[in-house]
Amino acid sequence: MTDEADADPQPFAAPPATGAPAADKPARKPRRAAPRTSEFRIAEQPAFVLHSYPYRETSLVIDVLTRDHGRIALVAKGAKRPHSALRGVLQTFQPLSLSWSGKSELRTLTGAEWVGGMLPLAGDALLCGFYANELLVKFCAREDPHPPLFQHYLVTLTRLAHGEPPVQVLRSFERVLLRETGYAMTLKRTVARRAVEPDKLYVFDPQRGVRDAGSDAPSHWPVIAGQTLLDMEEDDYHRAQTVAQSKTLMRFLLNTYLGGTPLATRQILIDLQNL
């Protein structure tokens, strides 16, 4: 590890108790990426590897989510060599402390340490982890930090590793992801500022929010029970109807906001586990 100044002595906070996402905000377009920083060296930044691919003969490019600098790309020089210390450290779904240098879009990794304290993902949880990583790559612009999203990703991996129901964990993560990247998810009030009623039917306008179901709504907008919207607001998925309708709603919203671009891991989840 490098000995740069300003190292964070406690890079990863303990995951908070699970619960409903934060307060609602008006729907808006995704934020633009933050201007590239002028910092040449960053030391001991909490991070997770989202994806990696070969770079030249012996190196890797790693796409990482960091707490304070957002999603960035780093060159891990020599990481493919048989005896490289980085080979066993740069793993997905494990908390890391990374250091790097450079001002270009592709920076140079200068140090990496495994923080530890997290169980490995396996089975369905592993598939869900790859799905979460793909969503982060698709929705998070480079160098656009989202500390609350970083923390919720940590919580999501922890919940998956401890065997919590994947359906509930994924729906909660999807909502936080959309909110933090600019797509608010107001579920307890309609666009007319009326409270959602559990016994009524609604549709979700991707650009405006919850609307009363009616003949003027496009046919491809899913019809959702008010009870489902209220349950999602409270992160409560014990009703079978809520499980089914929340999956339909989130699939519709993610597909809309991605412009129809398919998610490879979503199709795997649909085919294997219907998550």
From Swiss-Prot:
The gene is recO. Pfam families: RecO_C, RecO_N. Gene3D superfamilies: Nucleic acid-binding proteins (2.40.50.140), Recombination protein O, C-terminal domain (1.20.1440.120). Residues 1-38 are annotated as: Disordered. Belongs to the RecO family. SUPFAM superfamilies: ArfGap/RecO-like zinc finger, Nucleic acid-binding proteins. One of its GO terms (cellular component) is bacterial nucleoid. Keywords: DNA damage, DNA recombination, DNA repair. It comes from Burkholderia pseudomallei (strain K96243). This is DNA repair protein RecO. HAMAP family: RecO (MF_00201). Residues 8-24 have a biased composition (Low complexity). It comes from the Bacteria. InterPro entries: ARFGAP/RecO (IPR037278), DNA_rep/recomb_RecO_N (IPR022572), NA-bd_OB-fold (IPR012340), RecO (IPR003717), RecO_C (IPR042242). The keyword DNA repair applies. Involved in DNA repair and RecF pathway recombination. One of its GO terms (biological process) is DNA recombination. The keyword DNA repair applies.
